[in-house]
């Protein structure tokens, strides 16, 4: 009887851990890296806002769950700082940062960094 209770307790504990596992743990390095790129861009262009703070927290999670070398994330930050957002203007002339960030995360440059990082694994 004691063994049955112990087995039940272990089963429940194991099942509970699986339920609380982060959805990030099932994402590929490519998904995590692209989401990191998007979050990094949002944190950069929306500095000081609540969404920027949330983006930084998301970046930490994406980096934590990724198996890619840390250098890839530093290189991505350098790439972002060297990019030019001037062409992302609405018809009225205002900047469209979010459109830029979406395109940046899916850009060839980010994909090249990802490919390079994967080759270093």
Feature-to-residue mapping (PLM):
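N-terminal signal peptide c-region/cleavage motif recognized by signal peptidases
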Residues: 16-18
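Sec-dependent N-terminal signal peptides of Gram-positive bacterial secreted proteins and lipoproteins
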Residues: 12-14
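Compact alpha-helical subdomains of small soluble proteins
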Residues: 48-51, 55-121
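N-terminal secretory signal peptides
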Residues: 22-62
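Bacterial N-terminal signal peptides that target proteins for export
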Residues: 1-7
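Short Cys/His-rich Zn2+-coordinating modules
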Residues: 20-22, 82-83
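Hydrophobic alpha-helical context, especially transmembrane and signal-peptide helices
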Residues: 7-9, 30
